[in-house]
Amino acid sequence: MTTLTISIIVVFVLGYALIATESLTKVNKAAIALLMLVGCWTLYMVDPMQYLQMMHPDYTGGAAGMVEKVTGIIQEHLGETATTLFFLMGAMTIVEIVDQNGGFNWVRKVMKTKSKRALLWRIAFLTFFLSAILDNLTTSIVMIMILRKLVTDHKDRMIYASLVIIAANSGGAFSPIGDVTTIMLWNKGLITAAGVIAEIFIPSVVSMVIPALILQAMLKGELVMHEVSALQNASVSDFTEGQRKAVFWLGVGGLIFVPIFKSITHLPPFVGILLVLGVLWTATEVFYRSLHRGQDAEGTQKRVTKLLSRVDMSTILFFLGILMAVSCLAEIGVLTALGQGLNVAFDGNHYLVTGIIGVLSSIVDNVPLVAGCMGMYPVAAVGDMAVDGIFWQLLAYCAGVGGSMLIVGSAAGVVVMGLEKITFGWYMKHISWIAFVGYLAGIVSYWLIRTFLYAV
């Protein structure tokens, strides 16, 4: 490993440490993430040829075409990152439109209970199954908006929000369309829909239920009901009950439609999100036009043009910085070398290798880790490396669920961190060990299933 490579890693680790201590430094994590992005790629440009020769052996342009090649590489990574950012912005805007126009009101009535623990279990299972249909990012945004309608105490809401992260990641792990890593494995033909659902469903449930059992001990008594519910109801009286339900189904139903749209058109998911946003935007404009409210300020504030200003841009920029910094680590070969080193260190023990990959996925982006594994290990005709083999199914589980161990370890965690202002330190102190226990319990349950139910 060269001095330059070590320097890039040091910049990443230092930036990560500053993000982890945001509550102490009082420096916004988005600012640090952007500095990580610039720092890593600036160091990369000190001597990019060594990395081009290592990671792109087909490159023959020499020094003359080096800058153009690196520019193309950065643009490729930026394009991949942008699809995530546009998806996130679209999903956040859709949920904001539904929320501000009263679309979640009837959902709140269905979920409403005075018991804190009863609400915890309703939130857990709704998040779990919703995440299997949607992606865990969109599910987290939806559930946080619902929680804000139900829970006024921020300390309690942080506990519920933490469970949303765990349940969203667990729910996405057993579904071929629930998480970007399972989509990658499914599209590559390494797992089948029937196989991953049959064998990963129970471990995923276990990885969610165990933390929920522990977290419910932190919640005692009854919820404080909203004293301003009448005022809140009045604030959404612009739309009729039918219009509010139409907004809900156009928004949430549209989000559910996104994976279907992707499978039909083969276009990236963000295109489907923009389709849903366009349809919902048009519908609300038609509804508001029919109200004839003139220059009513309150009604104007709920129109999409105003709601766009409510999108949390610091979260978007944080995503940009983190994903692009991690892409630099991928380009210098660190992630691939890490995967190969694990395989050698643990002598090919699939449970240990994938288990460690899961832990690592809570530190760095799981997408390049999974991509590295897909590139390192060839598919076998039979055995643990075959389609639906132990390795690939464990990889789907560990890469998905492992991200719950740190709040920045998954897209769900990052967006909840931004929406609910949960600090890295608080999550690590109170939630990380709980998520780790659930993670290990899920792996054990998978071992039991493979050993006793599917043993040949």
Task: Cite the ranges covered by each PLM segment.
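Membrane-interfacial helix-loop connectors
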Residues: 40-51, 78-79, 130-167, 171, ...
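Transmembrane helical segments that form the transport core of multi-pass membrane transport proteins
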Residues: 60, 79, 101, 108-110, ...
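Transmembrane alpha-helix boundary signature
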Residues: 43-76, 92-109, 129-141, 328, ...
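Hydrophobic mid-bilayer segments of alpha-helices in multi-pass membrane transport proteins
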Residues: 6-15, 26-62, 81-93, 244-254, ...
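Transmembrane alpha-helical segments of multi-pass membrane transport proteins and ion-pumping complexes
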Residues: 41, 84, 88, 92, ...
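Interfacial loop-to-helix junctions that mark the boundaries of transmembrane helices
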Residues: 1-4, 24-27, 55-58, 67-84, ...
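Alpha-helical transmembrane segments
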Residues: 79-89, 195-213, 265-278, 392-402
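Juxtamembrane and boundary regions of transmembrane helices in multi-pass small-molecule transporters
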Residues: 4-7, 153-154, 158, 174-175, ...
